[in-house]
Amino acid sequence: MCERAARLCRAGAHRLLREPPPQGRALGGLLRWVGARMGEPRAPLVPDIPSADPGPGPAASRGGTAVILDIFRRADKNDDGKLSLEEFQLFFADGVLNEKELEGLFHTIDSDNTNHVDTKELCDYFVEHMGDYEDVLASLETLNHSVLKAMGYTKKVYEGGSNVDQFVTRFLLKETANQIQSLLSSVESAVEAIEEQTSQIRQDHCKPSHAVNESRYGGPTPPYIPNHKLVAPEPMKSLPVATGEPKEDGLEGQISRLAELIGRLESKTLSFDLQQRLSDEEGTNMHLQLVRQEMAVCPEQLSEFLDSLRQYLRSTAEERNCFHVAAVRMADGLTFVIYEFWETEEEWKRHLQSPVCKAFRHVKVDTLSQPEALSQISVPAAWCTSGRD
């Protein structure tokens, strides 16, 4: 199916490129000049590198390197041409490799021991492991330029072509989109299969710990009504609690305690008075994993970030092992803090592999003005148990 779609896509692109430009009617030579300018490729992915520079290694002559370089440039948040360990972990964290493994990979790529890797060095490393994906990425480079030319041609036809010319161009454009979407669906299916397999492997490794956690809880985690509204509270002000009728007695008190805890975290006055709040006789030796993400957003990317954040909060709140998730928008309007309560650290790491988390991570790479600040801490589960004062 993929080969047939690729052949049809290439045939359609060739037909579209071989189609002679329509004769100008109303604007004559001026229209043809504008159409030709629109048909020129824009912002090529291959960077302008002086020919005298031989490049760092064999990657310079390999196909697909331009796409990889373009991807890695997105991870370079401060545009200094290199990635720090924090930027590296933020961009590549997927819940499969832990922090130590990512750090080890970082130092492997950092062959000159400078505690940073430049995008070219990173590209060279991945090129050596591309395999058959070299042809795929090289084709993407060609497709990128071909699509840009086709869009310019389409604009020219619609400005000066006949109804028949417009009909043919419209048909070719839609069919090209269908064929590309068919290829994309095949790739997405492969991605989903790999993610499902990876998630199952990690779940099998973590089964003993989950059994202990369930027995200590004495039952499943109490349900709650998630709050899907993103608000902008004043500084040092806790989040509003979820609305709606609680499903169990004591649920409203749970959410109130969580909101109070978040408020204390935001004002940086959190203290653990275990003698006052907990006692071993009550079986309070179980903990929840609290994950805190602080993000500074670029002003021009704020709208895109907010849309993705709302989707992330909705999806995360529906996960069974996420006890609570909430977000705070700080007074400057561009700083956001997300708090997530997970049953175990392994559940949170498994969440990092989910499609919604990966999608949100890619949006953060494009919209944040600096790498996010991520921290985690164990919180006594008794604070979130019904019937506790």
Swiss-Prot record:
Protein function: May act as a signaling scaffold protein that senses intracellular calcium. Can modulate ligand-induced internalization of ADORA2A and coupling efficiency of mGluR5/GRM5; for both receptors may regulate signaling activity such as promoting MAPK1/3 (ERK1/2) activation.
Database matches in Pfam families: ABM, EF-hand_7
EF-hand domain residues: 63-98, 99-132
Protein name as annotated: N-terminal EF-hand calcium-binding protein 2
Keywords assigned: Calcium, Cell membrane, Cell projection, Coiled coil, Cytoplasm, Membrane, Metal-binding, Methylation, Repeat
PANTHER family hit by this protein: EF-HAND DOMAIN-CONTAINING PROTEIN, N-TERMINAL EF-HAND CALCIUM-BINDING PROTEIN 2
Quaternary structure and interacting proteins, as annotated: Interacts (calcium-dependent) with ADORA2A and GRM5.
Domain ABM: 289-377
Coiled-coil annotated residue ranges, if any: 173-198
Ranges annotated as spanning the membrane: none
Cellular component per GO, a single term: axon
Molecular function in Gene Ontology: A2A adenosine receptor binding; calcium ion binding; type 5 metabotropic glutamate receptor binding
Compartment(s): Cytoplasm; Cell projection, Dendrite; Cell projection, Axon; Cell membrane
A GO biological-process term: positive regulation of adenosine receptor signaling pathway
List of residues binding Ca(2+) 2: 110, 112, 114, 116, 121
Residues spanning the signal sequence: none
